[in-house]
């Protein structure tokens, strides 16, 4: 296999990172909704923590996307 085909295989594998970020964010907000349903008085604190966690999970997906773009255009 030449380097170009290996590069595109690596780019395809980067999709796993983006898929993982999507699963992480969906898990965070699913847990947030069930936690707020159980304890509505803690909604403000839970929402703040969920947004921080979602931002960190989404950052991993964006890093994976940036690396894939670097591989495509290098």
From Swiss-Prot:
GO cellular component, one term: plasma membrane
Pfam family, one: ATP-synt_C
Subcellular location, record wording: Cell inner membrane
SUPFAM superfamilies linked: F1F0 ATP synthase subunit C
Membrane topology: Multi-pass membrane protein
Record-stated family: Belongs to the ATPase C chain family.
Oligomer and partners: F-type ATPases have 2 components, F(1) - the catalytic core - and F(0) - the membrane proton channel. F(1) has five subunits: alpha(3), beta(3), gamma(1), delta(1), epsilon(1). F(0) has three main subunits: a(1), b(2) and c(10-14). The alpha and beta chains form an alternating ring which encloses part of the gamma chain. F(1) is attached to F(0) by a central stalk formed by the gamma and epsilon chains, while a peripheral stalk is formed by the delta and b chains.
Protein name: ATP synthase subunit c
Gene this protein is translated from: atpE
């Amino acid at each position: 296999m030449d380097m170009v085909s290996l590069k595109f295989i690596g780019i395809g594998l980067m999709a796993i990172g983006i898929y993982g970020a999507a699963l992480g964010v969906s898990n965070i907000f699913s847990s947030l909704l069930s936690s707020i349903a159980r304890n509505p008085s803690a909604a403000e604190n839970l929402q703040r923590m969920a947004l921080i966690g979602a931002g960190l999970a989404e950052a991993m997906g964006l890093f994976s996307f940036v690396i894939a773009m670097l591989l495509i255009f290098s």
